[in-house]
Regions:
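Beta-propeller domains with acidic blade repeats across secreted/periplasmic ectodomains
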Residues: 1-193, 204, 212-214
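Long, ordered, helix-rich scaffold segments
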Residues: 134-136, 157-167, 173-388
Length: 388
């Protein structure tokens, strides 16, 4: 909805922010901030002279490989380049759209170094199931604009301003207890072979197969993808296949319908989000099944709210009204509902008269209605001031 001016999101931390370096870390910016110097907090632990909380969390990845033990599935790896470590975070999905995290190693880190030039800046899942760590391997990590006089002295005192050693380093971290996947060049595979890889246990293979299919724009894969969407028992394969169809421009009501009938909430959520991208005529073909849906999880509610608005029928608006009333305090649901009501705000408000107490939501409906003559319809290419 081009008239949406609200910005909603979930920005709570996933897991602890604490760090456990294995060397003293005075070479971080604002390390001089300490209670002993009259500040309210400490940047470094006064007893160990080590950083207390992350200050330079950089590139991260979620482990989706096959080499590490099973308990590693969906653990996040976060690089901390200022204090020479890579943090592991155990992620839990509550099912209500929020993630939580714990530190699986207690007061130890998954990977840490005493070499002050070790600057991990990114992490990747590898084709063989291992993890690749990108190490900038450089003395100075701070941008010149933010090098304080304190930090400058730290760099100079230990010769960290000296020449870099090569062009950085790549580390492959693997489990000796697990096997490594054999490498294959996915660019040389046929469409049927790539579609089969959408069910692969290694997330790198799934992602890359999807990308190659879309890059090729090979629409001959469409029937195979539709079969995976409709019949596969692998939820991840169904989701990848659906979004491959989207990338090929082959989304349709018939391809999305099996997703909406799935038992797995994540599959249904993908189906709802894909449905919101359909042309109006195709979306209307899904009206009956969408109206029968009830959110199996709290996470599903915003996606259902988003797709009900464009249906623009009394039954759809009645269902949307009930969702909004039940989720009156959930900004994600309210934002999704309003986003789907492009050029329909006033009609929806009239249909649901007197049922809403949330004044912010009502004011957004009024604003959208007043802006309707001037704004583009969602889905049209925007230009000029509309593109801002």
């Amino acid at each position: 909805n081009p008239g949406v001016t609200t910005k909603v999101g979930e920005f709570s931390p996933v897991g602890p922010n604490a760090t456990w370096p294995i060397r003293v870390t005075p070479g971080v910016n604002r390390a001089y901030i300490a209670k002993k110097n009259g500040y309210a907090t400490d940047t470094l632990n006064p007893e160990t002279n080590k950083l207390i909380n992350c200050t330079a969390a950089a590139g991260m990845t979620v482990y989706r490989g096959t080499n590490f033990p099973k308990e590693w599935a969906n653990r996040a790896l976060v690089t901390e380049s200022c204090v020479q470590l890579v943090k592991a975070v155990e992620i839990k999905d509550s099912g209500n759209g929020k993630l939580s995290g714990t530190h699986p190693y207690g007061k130890d880190e998954w990977l840490a170094s005493t070499d002050e030039r070790f600057r991990p800046v990114n992490a990747y899942n590898a084709p063989d199931g291992s993890v690749i760590i990108v190490d900038m391997y450089h003395g100075i990590i701070q941008h010149k604009t933010f090098v304080t006089s304190y930090l400058r002295e730290q760099y100079l005192s230990r010769g960290l301003d000296g020449p870099a050693h090569g062009q950085g380093r790549l580390y492959r971290v693997r489990s000796t207890a697990g096997k490594l996947e054999a490498y294959q060049d996915l660019d040389k595979l046929t469409a049927p072979e790539l579609v089969k890889l959408l069910s692969h246990a290694n997330g790198w293979h799934r992602d890359t197969a999807q990308r190659v299919l879309v890059d090729r724009a090979d629409v001959s894969a469409t029937p195979l993808l539709e079969e995976v969407v409709a019949k596969s028992e692998n939820p991840l394969a169904r989701i990848h296949a659906l979004w491959t169809l989207e990338g090929l421009g082959k989304l349709s009501a018939s391809s999305i319908q099996p997703m909406l009938a799935a038992k797995n909430p994540k599959v249904v959520i993908s189906g709802l989000w894909a449905a919101s991208k359909l042309p109006q005529a195709e979306l209307e073909k899904l009206s009956a099944i969408i109206l029968k849906l009830e959110p199996a999880t709290e996470e599903m509610t915003p996606y259902l709210a988003r797709v009900l608005g464009p249906l623009a029928t009394p039954a759809a608006w009645e269902k949307l009204t009930n969702l909004v009333v039940k989720s009156d305090k959930n900004p994600l649901v309210l934002g999704a509902a309003y986003s789907g009501l492009d050029h329909q705000e006033l009609k929806f408000k009239e249909a649901a008269a007197g049922k809403f107490k949330n004044k912010d939501f009502l004011s957004q409906l009024d604003k959208g209605a007043s802006d309707a003559p001037a704004k583009k319809t969602a889905g049209e290419l925007l230009s000029g001031e509309n593109a801002a």
